[in-house]
Amino acid sequence: MQKIKKVCIYCASSENIDPKYFEATEKLARVLVKNNITVVYGGGSRGLMGRLADTIIAEKGRIVGIMPHFMKEVEFHHKDVNEFIFTADMHERKKQFMVGVDALITLPGGCGTMEELLEAMTLKRLGIFTKPIVILNAFGYYDHLIKMLEFSIEENFMKPIHSDIWKTFEDPEKVLEAIHQSTPWSKDALKYS
């Protein structure tokens, strides 16, 4: 079993969400710190992004923020994050999220979080990105998205093998188990995309 050293987390910047999502984020952050895993994330100081960073910093873990310059200029960046990478734009930011990570983890979020997740799934489908993609379906948040993905397979817009692109889990403390249970993926995936 490969040791997980670095993960990227996609998550929300919204502050107006149910406290249960913040609690799930804290639990996941603590598991990652306990296992000495570096976290790469969007660099924000608000919403789940802020709670993720605050928890990792409080627990003495390592977190890296990646953010376009224009977002720093309006003070969205978390000033206490260990390391920051500032990019020219959102496209470069998404590329940097995937550099050197052992897995991608998606927490509840809005259109930005879902867009990042779906792009990662597309890149995996094409064999460009081959690491585990796990979705924290806390409190059934992603039920409708998962049903839509399954429906796209049923309707032959994707193949049955594409259901192995992602793995869902509901308990934030089971994140490492979800990563390790993910189906290995090949760069040859383009052949059956």
What are these regions (language model features)?
Residues 2-100, 139-173, 177, 183-193:
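A cross-family phosphate/adenosyl-ligand binding-site feature
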Residues 43, 67, 87-88, 107-109, ...:
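Short beta->alpha connector loops at strand-helix junctions that form conserved
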Residues 92-127, 134, 184-193:
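Active-site/ligand-binding-proximal alpha/beta "capping" segment
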Residues 113, 123-129, 151-158, 181:
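Alpha-helix capping at helix-to-loop junctions
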Residues 129-131, 164:
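Short glycine-/polar-rich loops that comprise or flank the Walker A/P-loop
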